[in-house]
Amino acid sequence: MEFTDVFYNLENEKQFLAEIDELLTIPYEKNELEIGVSKFLSFINKYGEPYLITEFQLQRCMEKFLNSPLYQLDENAVLSIFYDCFFFLKEQQTLKFIIIVFQSEIQENEYCLRLLASTGFIPVLIKAMKQFKDRSENVAFTSFRYALFLVYYICRSRRLSPTDLVAIDEYFLVNLFKTSEEAWNDEDMDSFGMCVLTLLSINEQFMLVRLASKGSFEIANGIMDLLSSSKVDNGIYSEGLVFTLNREKDPRSRMLILKQLFLLFTTPATYEIFYTNDLNVLIDIFIREINNIPDELSDLRYAYLQVLIPLLENTQVRHPPHYKTKCIVDAVNNVLISHSKSSNMEDARTTDVAIRVLEVPWLQQEMKSLGTAQ
């Protein structure tokens, strides 16, 4: 697709928006769609910078576009044109606009999701994101957050190919950790949460590819490699995981956090990256959730119990003075009582993991002292 060069003499934002409206309402036939999209993107690229600075301005322009006759003539065809453009365009202004459209449509448009989830898009998106990571540049960082959402949404929708995963390199991950640290320090919880969810989704992808490979090939888990080293502040990340788990309601997001915690608590280099106070808060969360999770979320209850074992065995909570031992034992015993008489396979699995929690050596000693040994 070739961009067309048309000169406009714009003096203010009102004129810019008027030209946008005019471009988007030009009548086209379906076979002329690419011409209309080309004219629009060319205009955005050449004249957008003074008038597409804030998130509000970007959102307003996007809404005009999505509600326009040009887009509604054939939404999927326009998305395909945007997708093709994304692979060869280098102009930041145009890339930012395409990203915000994708971010809006991927949640509602199944075709958009299939398009972006195809192998090859993630590497190009990661490359574009490296231009937008500066939090001091508001519009660039807004585009970075939208692109992060795309990575997160694609990761939660399908298993990434090895080619896609390799593109998520150390440089990108280090900067994503640093961005999350800056957001945490600035108390920007929305940006921090998006960074953490994306890191958790990428971590899950590394876990999936390892399971699928069965030793035939090896792709190192870049998240765990960084957390095991001194290249990122794992203290902020671990504190943020506790913060997020304590407030998160979405079962899928909680499961992502639990998968990350399981890896951290079963990898010797990361056994003790959590502060003891944060571990105590984690124990409070686990007690609360094990007691309160409804039966329809039995997989989530099982995950909490499964992660509780290495938490008790490998982290510094294994050393006295132990925190809320009786509450831990009572919560696990409640699970055993409610599941022990069931013949359901899921209940049997939950019972097995609950018994394994109570077999943690120091917990057994504490139970004897409390007179509650099984």
Curated annotation (Swiss-Prot):
Belongs to the LDB17 family. InterPro entries: SPIN90/Ldb17 (IPR030125), SPIN90/Ldb17_LRD (IPR018556). It comes from the Eukaryota. May be involved in protein-linked oligosaccharide phosphorylation. Keywords: Cytoplasm, Nucleus. One of its GO terms (molecular function) is Arp2/3 complex binding. It is found in: Cytoplasm; Nucleus; Cell tip. Its main location: cytoplasm. The lineage of its organism: Eukaryota, Fungi, Dikarya, Ascomycota, Taphrinomycotina. GO terms for biological process: actin cortical patch assembly; actin cortical patch localization; Arp2/3 complex-mediated actin nucleation; endocytosis; protein localization to actin cortical patch. GO terms for cellular component: actin cortical patch; cell division site; cell tip; mating projection tip; nucleus. This is Protein dip1. Signal peptide: none annotated. The keyword Nucleus applies.
